[in-house]
């Protein structure tokens, strides 16, 4: 690719599980500039397991066939030390899916075998400022495993995705109130990307009006919260496969906001290491309301927490603490 004078230097974006369903929806949008901006060239560094390298070669052929002006180069490998070399951004999508009859402990153990070596590889070879987003489930605890195995990187650089839940929460509220999604601001997803997550409308607005003035409490507690939390299962039921394009879109949103900033006066939901804000145990990778500026995120402070919210926030924190205990027991984190 010829670089015009004055264009930015390419940044390196590593994606794992790159030949999978989410990867297939994600890579073309990153290469088109949807994630880092229409003026930012990218080098894609794609990691797959050895048996999937042939399929990945096909995806690379398609990426090349799009002739994206921003796609400076593509690297493929089954070795994380190659795929993560000097990476500025890393989207950890590849994970072990839950199989029938699998207990949570089995799933955490299987994913530990993926995320521990990936954390170690990021620690060794990635850019010291790498921004890491874990998409592969159980995302919060997988992010914790990777983070704890990368002791030389700032723990704040490891995040997990609750943006899909956040976007689902916006869309469900828009539908209920008959308003466009653009009218909705400041929803929060607290906690784990699991059925214990808490989609919180207490601060949300629709065209500037408090959301909870526009919907009844019964609908909010009994329908809205479970619908958002169980949407993934509903999609599997309907499509026969898990949400891929919407997950990829949420990953792009998460990284774009982190890299380029959130709109003034608005926040989004990201699962980030808790600093003890809102009484959430320190170190858990937990969904919080965040604002982003200059490539950094900060947890929004000073929000009023009702008794209802407190109970929901503590329940999802408890689940994350149990997951952390389990991976400690397995020797995956300290």
From Swiss-Prot:
Biological-process GO terms, alphabetical: malate metabolic process; tricarboxylic acid cycle
- Annotated GO MF terms: L-malate dehydrogenase (NAD+) activity
PANTHER family associated with the record = MALATE DEHYDROGENASE
Q: Name one Pfam family in it.
A: Ldh_1_C
Catalytic residue list: 193
Protein name as catalogued: Malate dehydrogenase
The record's annotation in NCBIfam families points to: MalateDH-SF1 (TIGR01759), PRK05442.1 (NF003916)
Species in which this protein is naturally found: Deinococcus geothermalis (strain DSM 11300 / CIP 105573 / AG-3a)
Task: Kindly state which keywords UniProt assigns to this record, in alphabetical order.
Answer: NAD, Oxidoreductase, Tricarboxylic acid cycle
């Amino acid at each position: 690719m010829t670089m015009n004078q004055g264009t930015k230097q390419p940044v390196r974006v590593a994606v794992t599980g790159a030949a999978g369903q989410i990867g297939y929806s994600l890579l073309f949008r990153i290469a088109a500039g949807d994630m880092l901006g229409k003026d930012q060239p990218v080098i894609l560094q794609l990691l797959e397991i050895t048996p999937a390298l042939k399929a990945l070669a096909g995806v690379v052929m398609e990426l090349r066939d799009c002739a994206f002006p921003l796609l400076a180069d593509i690297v493929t490998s089954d070795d994380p030390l190659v795929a993560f070399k000097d990476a500025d951004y890393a989207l950890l999508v590849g994970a072990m899916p839950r199989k029938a009859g699998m207990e949570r402990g089995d799933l955490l153990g299987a994913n530990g075998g993926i995320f521990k070596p990936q954390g170690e590889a990021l620690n060794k070879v990635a850019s010291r400022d790498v921004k890491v987003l874990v998409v592969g489930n159980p995302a919060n605890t997988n992010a914790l495993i990777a983070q704890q195995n990368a002791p030389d990187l700032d723990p704040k650089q490891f995040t997990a995705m609750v943006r899909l839940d956040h976007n689902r929460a916006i869309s469900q509220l828009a539908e209920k109130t008959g308003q466009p999604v653009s009218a909705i601001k400041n929803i929060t997803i607290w906690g784990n990307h699991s059925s214990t997550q808490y989609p919180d409308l207490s601060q949300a607005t629709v065209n500037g009006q408090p959301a909870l003035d526009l919907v009844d409490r019964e609908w909010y507690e009994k329908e809205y919260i479970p619908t958002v939390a169980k949407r993934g299962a509903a999609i599997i039921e309907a499509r026969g496969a898990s949400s891929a394009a919407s997950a990829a879109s949420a990953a792009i949103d998460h990284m774009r906001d982190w890299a380029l900033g959130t709109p003034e006066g608005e926040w989004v939901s990201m699962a980030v290491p808790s600093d003890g804000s809102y009484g959430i145990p320190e170190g858990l990778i937990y969904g919080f309301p965040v604002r982003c500026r200059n490539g950094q995120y900060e947890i929004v402070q000073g929000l009023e927490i009702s008794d209802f919210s407190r109970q929901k926030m503590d329940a999802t924190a408890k689940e994350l603490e149990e997951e952390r205990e389990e991976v400690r027991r397995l020797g995956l984190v300290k």
